[in-house]
């Protein structure tokens, strides 16, 4: 059997067997411990998330121009007839139902969350696409990229949590703008940042076994880099390949800043980072968390001294754009980047599942070695796993930015 076909067969088996293996235990794989659902914290009045201006690449991106019914870009808008959403439609034109596909997907996801959070209550849209000029100049409502929302019972005590649910549903910017509604917006359909997977900037630094530091873009298969093992201990792990490599891509990153000691890590919103709620948690119990969910007050693991690991409190989260995006894969599935411990994986929330799914690729590299030169773009095996995952895993296993689109 050809190696590529064998690898394809093994990858399918790994994904099919993963749910059963995840039930076995106890295990010492990072992220394997069962944990209660993460507590959702409502947004405060006038708070917005992420904590950057709406029309920056770290949020929904720049304004691209008003869309009119007779313009070429009108075909970018699609109607939303989801029966679980109430549209106010005070203009009686159906305009509030029109939005970009990205906005529609996020809104449909939010509608499910609202019904789960408050049985008998539905999501209500008071404003969607605006063709009448009722909003401020360069409002994303003019492009169908923004909605103003409430709950169907108009209970203002729910609006802070509604805003948090909108963040969780994958809106690129959420603002508790008014006591009468929540404002949500998304990136443009053309935005490269809207399609970003899980990566780090190419100039971010990894630590080699000899103590030298090297930019991620310069990593070569076979080099050993500082990482973390399943017991939460520092180790040096073989670098195998890039799961994604985009040297020229303009990419939106989340920048996580810590103090005591001060560290700064840039990574894409869908990437996994190991997080705890307090500094006393053992390293092995830090949970895999999407970068977009990391908040000030959380603790991450950082490298100190001669390779030791310790917790550091997150004091700031902001957006930044950079050229180049790289997603290294190591044998342990973790990597220390700019002295912060991160996962090699993104899009899927379970570190253990991702590590198991990449077992055939690790075996392939052990037996046959990797290619000398890797081309740009998404690694074929990573793309294959994502397609298999979409068929086999429930949508809520994915980060909202990478979840399969709803069909309503």
Curated annotation (Swiss-Prot):
Lipidation sites (Cholesterol glycine ester): 198
The organism's taxonomic lineage, starting at the top: Eukaryota, Metazoa, Chordata, Craniata, Vertebrata
Lipidation (N-palmitoyl cysteine): 24
Role played: Plays a role in embryonic morphogenesis; it is involved in the regulation of endochondral skeleton formation, and the development of retinal pigment epithelium (RPE), photoreceptors and periocular tissues.
Biological source species: Gallus gallus
Family statement drawn from the similarity comment of this UniProt entry: Belongs to the hedgehog family.
Primary enzyme class: hydrolase
Domain of life (superkingdom): Eukaryota
Gene3D superfamilies per UniProt: 3.30.1380.10, Hedgehog/Intein (Hint) domain
Site residues (Involved in cholesterol transfer), renumbered to this chain: 244
Record-marked site positions (Essential for auto-cleavage): 271
Signal sequence region: 1-23
Gene name of the encoded protein: IHH
Protein name: Indian hedgehog protein
